[in-house]
Amino acid sequence: MKYLCVYYQIIRKVFWNMKTFLFQGDSITDANRDDENNDNFGMGCGYAFLLASEFERNNKGKIKFINRGKSGDRITDVYARIKEDIINLKPDFMSILIGVNDVSHELTMNCGVSPEKFKKIYGMLIEEIRESLPEIKIIILEPFILKGSCTEKLWEEFNAEVRKLAEISKQVAEISDLDFVPLQDKFDKISSDGDTRYWSVDGIHPTSAGHQVIKEELHKVIENYI
């Protein structure tokens, strides 16, 4: 199935001149997608689905969206998938939302990724993608955190560490001259009344309303390309 998908991307570019947008990240991007059927349920039920629905509806035959977010992924896991789930798909545009698992896995299972390693691997990821796909446009989304059932017991640690990776994500974008989509301040503002559960199920995973917020912020950047 995956080989057919790669072949389809090549045919699409050569004969139809259709652009491809790739979503990459962890469970927030994955959003329960069906990884065996990307044309139907493969977008999941999150911000990737919301964004793809709008742009594909208004740009028929011009752009195709693919979701390769994977639940549980850290930056090291995305890097490990660089060939199969990024380069081989030959996307023209790509967004990445990663970082919260690098923190949560460390705090809860002692198998996360340190800020120093996060920055190094993120930089390597961007560099190697550009070496293979020099024309690609990459957008980095800021990892974010809210207080919820998954984060409240270690809230100070979660909050501090995720914000460190958020700043590093911004630095990686600046160093590589990439578009950066800030999200933490947005979620802080809209949840300032203390009702974080309206925006996030557990402090990590967005609700439908939370996914809509991510979609709207990413939309502001993508509309400059499409």
What are the language-model segments listed below?
Residues 70-75:
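Functional beta-strand-loop-alpha-helix junction segments that form "active/interaction loops"
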Residues 53-61, 77-226:
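Alpha-helical cap/lid subdomain in secreted, periplasmic
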